Design a protein with these regions (language model features):
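Short, structured surface patches at the beginning of a domain
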Residues: 1-131
Length: 131
């Protein structure tokens, strides 16, 4: 039997406005749902990364997101788990860069509500169609 790679997740949660927080996208609600998902998938949670009141317009302007990428590059996690893809990025260009970076570091992206899962062939195909 082959050794299965340990699944270590960084949970990424973000809200840009108070309205989003009130409409069911609060940081607490996102975190709770993603913790449940990680438990279901038997992922170890390395850390929860929170960007509050920050737009998805530019990935470089989000401190927690950048810390998560640094931790991924350092080999501390191999999955990034988010509630929806728009919590990660709204930019096609940023998504292209992110997917390439994830592939380079053998890391996968899972977005619970959008059925994004780059650890599967169908999931990678779906994300590539978006870019």
């Amino acid at each position: 039997m082959e050794n299965e790679e340990k699944k270590i997740a960084g949970i990424y949660i973000r809200v840009s406005t108070e309205d989003q927080a009130r409409e069911g996208f609060s940081l607490g609600e996102q975190e709770e749902k993603l913790r449940q998902l990680c438990k279901y998938k038997d992922f170890e949670i390395f850390k929860v990364y929170k960007d509050a009141g920050i737009s998805a317009k530019n990935m470089k302007d989000r401190p927690a997101f950048q810390q998560m990428l640094d931790d991924m590059k350092a080999g501390k996690l191999n999955y990034i788990v988010a509630y929806k893809l728009d919590r990660v990025t709204r930019s096609v260009r940023d998504l292209e860069v992110l997917i390439s970076t994830l592939e380079q570091y053998h890391c996968y992206l899972i977005c619970d509500r959008d059925d994004v899962n780059t650890s599967t062939a169908n999931g990678r195909f779906f994300v590539r169609m978006l870019t």
